[in-house]
A protein has these predicted regions:
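A detector for short, charged/polar N-terminal pre-domain segments
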Residues: 1-13
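Intrinsic disorder/low-complexity signal
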Residues: 2, 16, 42, 60, ...
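C-terminal structural segments of small proteins and small subunits
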Residues: 49-77
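A basic, amphipathic helix-loop patch mediating RNA/tRNA/ribosome contacts
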Residues: 13-56
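Generic alpha-helical hydrophobic packing signal
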Residues: 7, 39, 66-68
Length: 77
């Protein structure tokens, strides 16, 4: 399984934007399709809301990819 660590730059990121930002989806539109198809899990549960707010310490899974969402870097805030 591929593990990706993503550090937030603000309080949350919409799910479809996270998929695009991590390169899991080629575009925001593709991210929305993946979510709508029920292929994405957030903290182990299928998530169908395309703009679900993903916050620190959540885990997003798509196929064999797992994204760990890290808190905002205090040095950059």
């Amino acid at each position: 399984m591929q593990e990706i660590q993503f550090t937030l730059t603000r309080e949350f990121i919409p799910l479809c934007d996270l998929l695009k930002a991590t390169g899991v989806a080629d575009s925001g539109g593709m991210g929305k399709v993946l979510v709508a198809d029920g292929q994405v899990k957030v903290d182990g549960q299928v998530e169908l809301r395309k703009t679900c707010k993903i916050r620190e310490n959540q885990i997003v899974e798509l196929g064999d990819v797992r994204i760990h969402v890290l808190p905002i870097d205090a040095n950059e805030a």
